[in-house]
From Swiss-Prot:
Transmembrane segments: none annotated. The lineage of its organism: Bacteria, Pseudomonadati, Pseudomonadota, Alphaproteobacteria, Rhodobacterales. Signal peptide: none annotated. This is DNA mismatch repair protein MutS. Belongs to the DNA mismatch repair MutS family. GO terms for cellular component: cytosol. GO terms for biological process: mismatch repair. Keywords: ATP-binding, DNA damage, DNA repair, DNA-binding, Nucleotide-binding. The gene is mutS. This protein is involved in the repair of mismatches in DNA. It is possible that it carries out the mismatch recognition step. This protein has a weak ATPase activity. ATP binds at residues 627-634.
């Protein structure tokens, strides 16, 4: 786009825009960020704001739209969520400075930041209880790695990640943005995980340049002290640091030293299993109904993020798991300490994100106050926790609360209790902290008092009681009176003292020599006070940055205590037990419950039926579960997988007792739907997920499979389910729960030593089925599908016909004939005519009341009351 025919300002805009062609340019003009040309058209549509015009270019109007600077963050969030990148261009000098270079000089402007989904730091742009990860995937020869960072908290990690595993780790981390080398074929995979895919030149992934970037970031000569990293690790980490240099324009965040994770140290959960188990979000995509929402009792933002990370990445390291369980047990056994810690934690702000904003020079007085308040509560906890008898997790956390007294005292002396959000507002430094500031404030405030006195004196001198001394940004201080009284002040002798400044429609404005002099004194004092406060803020900010590493450790310790005490409160309130996790192959659950379903049932006043599960080697590591739909098979499958995950994240579990041999992988194939975008039917999705399980599950895996083979013809489905179970038993040799409606498979329990039949119990009454939700040893005799269909509300004629068809099919199978042919030959004469519904049988009040009763839902007291009620109805009839 040519800049020859545009104004100097527009020429500057075009030059800056040329360097940021892939982003919307927020171009600062006074109190607004303006956008022009195509940026304006796109932004106006995305933000639903007015599209106007400003000047012409090549004889065409230039489209323009803008947003106020003070409200820009809200608009930024909308644009980022809609997939845009935004380059923020600020005025780097005052317009008065530009005018000194000539009347046509343009204010100097620079892009100070490139805002992308993975580089957000402002509180208003982030979810407080969720990480905001920026990830990078790098491949060097045969090795590949995934690195990720949250610049709002400083977390920085990397791990080896074969391309085949990338989907698993993207599902675990849920990054907002992923950096890829140009020319890759992974964009669609990244976008499937609802992350923005950003392609960079291959030079950005150069591992040699990465070492230089990392050494420069941490101020070290080499990276040996950080551990051993492969070239692919360095490539991924270097791409992230280079991208941060690009987007933050030289103001790099405070990143912790990179930590190398190892896949074998974590419980592996693939994307389909995470989705099916609804760990962090429900199948509908929201938080309601997810396991995380049900178990979250944290009271700090950093604690909530740590809990979410633990649930997404449970441990497979016995020592870590046991240390966490020991920490929860200590909290439960010391209720007074538990209450003290929780009380203190409720007053802890988000120190991590405050620290990050201060490091990037985007912070304000409230971020300093967040550091101060967090350190104050850390000191409270350091004093409250005993010096001995603390388990390792608690002792390590306490050790990080010391050594901050000097910084805490400095911030407590320097800041008022509730400082404003922005530095430019001033008024955040406490009185008595700085003598020069106190003097400037006194002069400023006294000057304002003098102004009030001058107004009274002017009113008396002129005899105009309504006279006012006012202020605006254009005239400064001025005297205002109505037009009615203006003639008096414009005439001698008052005109000798009162100098006319401005006439408006309703008033006339004046000034005096002494008012102008006082205005200068006030402005100078106010400006000096604000300048001093800004200088003090910078001194305090630097003091915080110097202590950043120790402050980050302190914040992590507070988060650790928040998580361990939150899990203790959860266990206490929900009656959860301490699981025993060891290196055996045991899986013994007594009285297990599904935490999310139990919470939902409690809300409706319905009790949850507890069930046992034993997949230990001494019993049978595979249970073949049969029973009708709606009986609770899927709930039983899921609850046992959730119990394993909760145990290995360090939580107590919803059971009366639990012993779990370490689980290395959890796989789930429950429920399916079409994948239209990739041309996959429900059955194809089911087969792909089943194939992944059979190909990947090791002997320490826990597998739950629900109704394999249901999406195809009966014998095809039975064959696939049969072969799948045999493979799990003979090849994978893992612990598994296998639910099916193929009752023919129950005979496998007699042939395969590691398979045992189990069923969900039901009762029949007058042709109806009653679900007991109890899992028992043995096989179901049938699936009760027709009864469930009746409960679902199918028309009576359809239910009646279904019973006839079922009877014919079952009798035909027993006789060895062709039941389907018999059905076709015996179609009703008027098959298309719906038979009239049977006449409703007259019912008495007693019969109607009996029909409404759900016996399993009655408490003993309710049952006794019901007996008296039924006796009364019987006597009446």
């Amino acid at each position: 786009m040519s800049s020859k025919t545009v104004t100097p300002m527009m020429a500057q805009y075009l030059e800056i825009k040329q360097d940021h062609a892939d982003a919307l340019l927020f171009y600062r003009m006074g109190d607004f960020y303006e956008m022009f040309f195509d940026d304006a058209v796109e932004a106006a549509a995305a933000l639903d704001i007015a599209l106007t015009k400003r000047g012409k270019h090549d004889d065409a109007d230039i489209p323009m739209c803008g947003v106020p600077v003070h409200a820009a963050e809200g608009y930024l969030l909308t644009l980022i969520r809609k997939g845009f990148r935004v380059a923020v261009c600020e005025q780097m000098e005052d317009p008065a400075e530009a005018k000194k270079r000539g009347s046509k000089s343009v204010v100097r402007r620079e892009v100070v930041r490139l805002v992308t989904p993975g580089t957000l730091t402002e509180a208003s742009l982030l979810e407080a209880r969720r990480h905001n990860y920026l990830a990078a995937f790098a491949k060097v020869r045969d090795d590949s790695a995934l690195a990720w960072v949250d610049i709002s908290t400083g977390e920085f990690r990397v791990m080896a990640c074969p391309a085949a595993r990338l989907s698993v780790d993207l599902a675990r981390l849920a990054p907002r943005e992923v950096l890829l080398a140009e020319g890759n074929d992974l964009r669609s995979l990244v976008e499937e995980h609802e992350a923005a895919a950003t392609e960079l030149g291959r030079a950005s992934f150069d591992s040699t340049a990465a070492v230089d970037r990392l050494c420069r970031l941490y101020g070290v000569a080499d990276l040996e002290a950080f551990g051993s990293f492969e070239r692919a690790d360095l490539s991924a980490m270097g791409a992230i640091v280079g991208y941060l240099e690009l987007t933050q324009k030289g103001k790099l965040p405070l990143l912790r030293k990179p930590v190398k994770e190892r896949a074998q140290h974590g419980l592996q959960i693939d994307a389909a299993t995470r989705r099916n188990l609804e760990l962090t979000q429900s199948l509908s995509g929201g938080r309601e109904g997810a396991l995380l929402t049900v178990i979250d009792r944290t009271v700090t933002a950093q604690g909530a993020r740590l809990l979410a990370r633990r649930l997404a990445s449970p441990s497979a390291d016995l020592s870590i798991i046991r240390t966490r369980h020991e920490g929860v047990r200590y909290a439960l056994e010391a209720p007074e300490i538990l209450d003290t810690v929780r009380t203190a934690l409720r007053q802890v702000p988000d120190m991590d994100r405050a620290l990050s904003r201060l490091a990037l020079d985007r912070g304000g007085p409230r971020d300093l106050a967040a550091i101060r308040n967090g350190l104050a509560q850390a000191a409270t906890l350091a004093e409250a926790l005993p010096d001995d008898a603390l388990p390792p997790l608690w002792a390590q956390s306490k050790s990080r609360f010391f050594g901050h007294d000097a910084l805490r005292d400095l911030l407590e002396k320097a800041l008022i209790a509730e400082p404003p959000l922005l530095t430019r507002d001033g008024g955040f430094v406490a009185s008595g902290y700085n003598v020069d500031l106190d003097e400037a404030r006194q002069l400023r405030d006294e000057g304002r008092g003098v102004i009030a006195g001058m107004q009274a004196e002017y009113a008396e001198a002129t005899g105009i009681a309504s006279l006012k001394v006012k202020h605006n940004n254009v005239l400064g201080y001025f005297i205002e009176t109505t037009a009615t009284h203006a003639d008096k002040m414009l005439s001698p002798p008052l005109s000798d003292r009162f100098i006319h400044r401005q006439t408006t429609a309703n008033a006339v404005r004046f000034t005096t020599v002494e008012l102008s002099e006082m205005e200068t004194r006030i402005l100078n004092a106010g400006g000096r006070a604000l300048a001093l406060e800004k200088s003090i803020f910078e001194e305090l900010r630097q003091a915080v940055i110097v202590a950043a590493a120790e402050l980050s450790d302190c914040a992590r310790a507070l988060a650790e205590l928040d998580v361990v005490t939150a899990l203790a409160v959860l266990a206490r309130d929900e009656d959860w037990c301490a699981p025993k996790v060891d290196d055996s192959r045991a899986f013994e659950i007594s009285g297990g419950r599904h935490p999310v379903v139990e919470a939902a049932l409690r809300a409706s006043g319905t009790p949850f039926i507890r069930n046992d599960c034993d997949l230990s080697e001494g019993a049978a590591p595979i249970w073949l579960l049969t029973g009708p739909n709606m009986a609770g098979k899927s709930t039983f499958l899921r609850q046992n997988a959730l119990i394993a995950i909760l145990a290995q994240m360090g939580s107590y579990v919803p059971a009366t007792a639990a012993r779990i041999g370490l689980v290395a992988q959890v796989f789930s194939r429950v429920g399916a739907s079409d994948d239209l975008a990739r041309g996959r039917s429900t059955f194809m999705v089911e087969m792909v997920e089943t194939a992944a399980i059979l190909n990947q599950a090791g002997d320490r895996a826990l597998v739950i499979l629900d109704e394999i083979g249901r999406g195809t013809a009966t014998y095809d489905g039975l064959s696939i389910a049969w072969a799948t179970l045999e493979h799990l038993h003979g090849v994978n040799r893992c612990r598994a729960l296998f639910a099916t409606h193929y009752h023919e498979m129950t005979g496998l329990a007699a042939q395969l030593s590691g398979v045992e039949n189990a069923t969900v119990a039901v009762k029949e009454h007058d042709g109806d089925v009653i679900f007991l939700h109890e899992v028992r040893r043995g096989a179901a005799d049938r699936s009760y599908g027709v009864q469930v269909a009746k409960l679902a509300g199918l028309p009576p004629s359809v239910v009646a016909r279904a019973r006839e068809v079922l009877k014919t099919l079952e009798s035909g199978e027993r006789s060895g004939g062709n039941p389907a042919k018999a059905l076709l030959e015996d179609l009703p004469l008027f098959a298309n005519a719906a038979p009239p519904p049977p006449p409703a049988a007259p019912t008495s009040a007693l019969e109607a009341r009996l029909a409404d009763i759900s016996p399993d839902a009655l408490s003993p007291r309710e049952a006794l009351d019901l007996v008296y009620e039924l006796k009364s109805l019987a006597d009446r009839d």
